[in-house]
């Protein structure tokens, strides 16, 4: 059974373009089979290297499911059914439901942090930013997100890439979403086949530039202890339908990448 879903009804609601570090990312709100969803394409560099964001989004959501973390579910749909969404050498788009209700507002962490530092007169720094995030989200949710990002090698958790849900004047942490820059989505074929290059994919945001440093901010366990070999096998089995859509070279690299990064999960178990 193919993991690519075929919807019956599609209606464009609002087209959007987002500027990323890799250029413009095409996305839009749609009614798909009477559900309001966000549809996203993939990116391309000036050098013409296309990203694999839709595949990474879906695999990351499946991994979050295995880890029992709050997350938004993503699916793949054929790109040709969404002609308003630009894709580059990619036959699929990622699709996820709107996860807020009409009486909820979503605020970027970046905007809240700017307002906080402006009101307090405190200078912004990576340390101050991290402490504010701990106050805002609490350790458990924040640490789980950082551990998850480290495991999947998410390069793009910038300050506009996680939010706060406000409902009736109260703050709530959102489910984890927007993981397109993970799981070697931006690795070239050359980087996939070179083991040393592949394992260098450890860029992090927003508190440190490398996951090896950012994971050290976690000072208490946030994941249950489990057998890492069994966990790895369950994860690979769960994402295997998506891996089957990729070249064997890329699928193998992702499997090895995740095995290598298990130590990040182990560091947060207890």
Regions from the PLM with identified roles:
Residues 68-73, 126-129, 204-210:
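Short C-terminal domain-edge/linker segments immediately following a structured domain
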Residues 124-188:
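Conserved kinase catalytic-core segment
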Residues 169-270:
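C-terminal catalytic region of ATP-dependent kinase domains
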Residues 64-65, 119-123, 198-203:
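Glycine-rich loops and low-complexity Gly/Arg-rich segments
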Residues 1-112:
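Conserved ATP-binding subdomain of kinase catalytic cores across diverse folds
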Residues 58-66, 140, 144-148, 256-263:
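A broad, structural surface signal
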Residues 95-146, 237, 264-265:
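ATP-dependent phospho-/nucleotidyl transfer catalytic cores
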Residues 57-61, 113-118, 193-196:
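Short, low-complexity, polar/charged sequence segments that are solvent-exposed and flexible
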């Amino acid at each position: 059974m193919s993991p690519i879903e075929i919807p019956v009804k599609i209606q464009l609601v609002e087209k959007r373009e987002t500027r990323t570090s890799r250029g413009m990312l095409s996305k839009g709100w749609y009614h798909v089979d009477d559900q309001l969803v966000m549809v996203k394409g993939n990116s391309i560099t000036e050098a013409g290297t296309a990203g694999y964001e839709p595949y990474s989004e879906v695999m990351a959501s499946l991994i979050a499911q295995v880890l029992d973390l709050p997350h938004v579910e993503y699916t793949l749909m054929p790109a040709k059914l969404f002609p308003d969404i630009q894709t580059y050498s990619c036959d699929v788009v990622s699709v996820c439901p709107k996860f807020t209700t009409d009486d909820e507002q979503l605020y970027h962490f970046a905007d809240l942090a700017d307002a906080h530092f402006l009101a307090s007169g405190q200078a912004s720094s990576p340390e101050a930013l991290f402490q504010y995030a701990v106050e805002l989200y609490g350790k458990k949710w924040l640490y789980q997100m950082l551990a998850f990002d480290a495991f999947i090698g998410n390069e793009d958790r910038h300050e506009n890439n996680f939010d706060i849900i406000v409902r009736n004047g109260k703050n709530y942490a959102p489910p984890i979403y927007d993981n397109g820059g993970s799981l070697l989505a931006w690795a070239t074929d050359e980087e996939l086949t070179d083991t040393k290059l592949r394992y260098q994919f450890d860029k992090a945001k927003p508190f440190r530039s490398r996951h090896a440093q950012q994971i050290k901010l976690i000072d208490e366990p946030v994941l249950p202890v489990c057998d890492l070999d069994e966990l790895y096998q369950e994860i690979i089995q769960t994402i295997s339908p998506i891996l089957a859509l990729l070249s064997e070279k890329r699928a193998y690299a992702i499997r090895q990448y995740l095995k290598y990064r298990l130590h990040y999960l182990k560091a947060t178990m207890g």
